[in-house]
Amino acid sequence: MQLDIIAVGQMRGAGEMPLVEEFHQRIEASGRQLGISGLSIIELREKRALTGGDKKRSENALIADALARRSGPLIVLDETGTSLTSRAFADKLQGWIERGDSDVTFVIGGADGLDDAIRGRADLVLSFGPMTWPHMLARVLLCEQLWRAISILTRHPYHRD
């Protein structure tokens, strides 16, 4: 199973980048035990020249285009979504693995968020709590939680209850 993250914006050596790279390596190394073939991060260009609704529509069109080539479960990150414990998230991942899904796609929108059409396609709208997170930090949180879920499923000592 392939894990894909589609995210608006590009990491440019920011402080978050080393964290994403570290969790990416851990996911790829330990995920093999579970049948996870890898993690891809697809960065979509942020539309800085546009504002408001035009920016959101343009970025969401890029996301929709990227999703056209995906067939597995779609999980979008949105502050209005469902909050899960790390164990519940690991259970979701286990379910996708057991079901034999070939890929699972996570979407992180830009600063103006996701439109209803993208959220409506989601199998799960996931929230990291009611607070608003910068999309670059949301990427770190998602990578960490993917690694944590894998560590729970492989009984690695990283996660402690």
Predicted features and spans:
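N-terminal beta1-alpha1 ligand-phosphate binding loop
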Residues: 1-31
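Hydrophobic/aromatic beta-strand patches that form the interior of the parallel beta-sheet core
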Residues: 6, 42, 75, 124-126
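Short glycine-rich anion-binding loops that position phosphate/pyrophosphate groups of nucleotides
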Residues: 11, 79-82, 110-113
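Short, surface-exposed alpha-helical segments at coil->helix boundaries
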Residues: 17, 21-25, 60-61, 116-119
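Conserved strand-to-helix beginnings and helix N-cap segments that scaffold or border functional pockets
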Residues: 17-20, 86-90, 119, 139
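S-adenosyl-L-methionine/SAH cofactor-binding core of RNA-modifying enzymes
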Residues: 36-104
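Structured adenosyl-cofactor binding patch, chiefly the S-adenosyl-L-methionine
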Residues: 112, 116-161
